[in-house]
Amino acid sequence: MEGKEEDVRLGANRYSERQPIGTAAQGTEEKDYKEPPPAPLFEAEELTSWSFYRAGIAEFVATFLFLYISILTVMGVSKSSSKCATVGIQGIAWSFGGMIFALVYCTAGISGGHINPAVTFGLFLARKLSLTRALFYMVMQCLGAICGAGVVKGFQEGLYMGAGGGANAVNPGYTKGDGLGAEIVGTFVLVYTVFSATDAKRSARDSHVPILAPLPIGFAVFLVHLATIPITGTGINPARSLGAAIVYNRSHAWNDHWIFWVGPFIGAALAAIYHVVIIRALPFKSRD
């Protein structure tokens, strides 16, 4: 019984040296930074752990809520003939960014607050979590996104189908290359922000500055949406794009769908490489 309680207490943060999203790094007893051990590729014992499934449920619920609120916001803008009468692009961007801020804050201590297969993929490449957990998270994120978009359609089917269902696509006037580039760079910004905001190295260097990781992550999502909504409607989250595409299920949603998987995964991989090879490889020793 004691072992189970300890397992639940640790939750997703089974490796105490690694820093979950949304929490401040600890370890002020020793100022010199120590490289945390990498996560194992496979960890069979995770499959028997309640914390493993609890984390997956948290990812499902968070992605469900993310799609529900954000797609509803898109529908509210789409149903009006005058964008001045709605929250407009800025409001959509705030909806996406604000929800990520809130949901990362809520789920950080349970699952790490990924809510995005691209973020999970980037953290996996950086050996922050096992392949077992990464695949489980991605499945739960996609299922949550499908359910979230499905509930929006259930409430407002006519508007949902008439307004494109919030599905991502390359907008007229832009090429597929433009869309792919926007997704790569946008996801790089997001995943790089995730790495930077949650790097335990900040504990040794900036221990006097409290950091709330969800804030810069949500703000990054907001800014990327402002920049790329006119190009692709902003994906940077394969689960978000898949959920809207499956529920809308028209050719418009599938023609360019590959862009919203390939682009985010390339962007996440580049951010992981940059963080691990360039940023984390620099010699570091804090001042006494």
Swiss-Prot record:
Annotated transmembrane regions: 57-77, 92-114, 135-155, 177-197, 211-231, 259-279
Membrane topology, record value: Multi-pass membrane protein
Top-level taxonomic group: Eukaryota
Induction annotation: By nitrate in roots. Expressed in roots with a circadian rhythm showing an increase at the end of the night period, a peak during the first part of the light period and then a decrease.
Main localization, broad class: membrane
Region (Disordered): 1-36
Cellular component per GO, a single term: plasma membrane
InterPro entries recorded: Aquaporin-like, Aquaporin_transptr, MIP, MIP_CS
Chain span(s) of sequence motif NPA 1: 116-118
Alphabetized PANTHER family for the sequence: AQUAPORIN OR AQUAGLYCEROPORIN RELATED
Functional note: Water channel required to facilitate the transport of water across cell membrane.
Family: Belongs to the MIP/aquaporin (TC 1.A.8) family. PIP (TC 1.A.8.11) subfamily.
Name under which the protein is recorded: Aquaporin PIP1-5
Lineage: Eukaryota, Viridiplantae, Streptophyta, Embryophyta, Tracheophyta
Gene name of the record: PIP1-5
